UniProtKB/Swiss-Prot annotation:
Catalyzed chemical reaction(s): N-(5-phospho-beta-D-ribosyl)anthranilate = 1-(2-carboxyphenylamino)-1-deoxy-D-ribulose 5-phosphate
Gene3D superfamilies associated with the record: Aldolase class I
Assigned keywords, A-Z: Amino-acid biosynthesis, Aromatic amino acid biosynthesis, Isomerase, Tryptophan biosynthesis
Pathway: Amino-acid biosynthesis; L-tryptophan biosynthesis; L-tryptophan from chorismate: step 3/5
Matching PANTHER family: N-(5'-PHOSPHORIBOSYL)ANTHRANILATE ISOMERASE (PTHR42894:SF1)
GO biological process: L-tryptophan biosynthetic process
Gene: trpF
NCBIfam families: PRK01222.1-1
Family classification: Belongs to the TrpF family.
Cross-referenced HAMAP family: PRAI
InterPro entries: Aldolase_TIM, PRAI_dom, RibuloseP-bd_barrel, TrpF_fam
SUPFAM superfamilies: Ribulose-phoshate binding barrel
Name used for this protein in its record: N-(5'-phosphoribosyl)anthranilate isomerase
Source organism of this protein record: Paracoccus denitrificans (strain Pd 1222)
Amino acid sequence: MAVSVKICGLTEAAGLAAAVDAGARYVGFVFFPKSPRHVTPGTAAELAAQVPLGVAKVGLFVNPDDAALDAVLAHVPLDVIQLHGAETPARVAEVKARTGLPVMKAVGVADPQDLDALWDYGLVADMLLIDAKPPKDAVLPGGNGLAFDWRLLAGRQILKPWLLAGGLTPENVHEAIRLTRAPGVDVSSGVESAPGVKDPDRIRSFIARATAPIL
């Protein structure tokens, strides 16, 4: 089965075009003001209009209230809501019911016990994004370029479709997929030339290596 690729934190047309043309299955827009990848609903709407059918538009939110979700959805035709904060399983279910959209929940992992949350969130979310847990003093909940021990996922059965994230780059994504057998991968900082600035060449390289056969 082909690996699905999500390019997250897109802010301009060149990066978006590179992702779409190279075969990304998901493109992500960040609605978190503290992130260097933050976009306004207006900018996201302009970019979303350039996304062809068959590529899912994902909106990343961090602990959003209903008003924050409504403000974006009034302008941007998202296909998936990504929750990347400390949202509880109950809140995940609320967001799913309120928006009528599939919800992808990020789960931060640093050690084996963190994997227990995959069960709780797997009962309510449509998809899971397994990311490196950010440091306690981190401003951003993701996109920090940090990886976790991928061997923690080896042979593990996960309830829902999932993406591997955290510290992935064109240089290591193939090995990460080999170790985890991840059905999908997510990248943001690993395909940038500077924080928030996507590098089209690195996007193309990442997707090519992520989708190369595992021997």
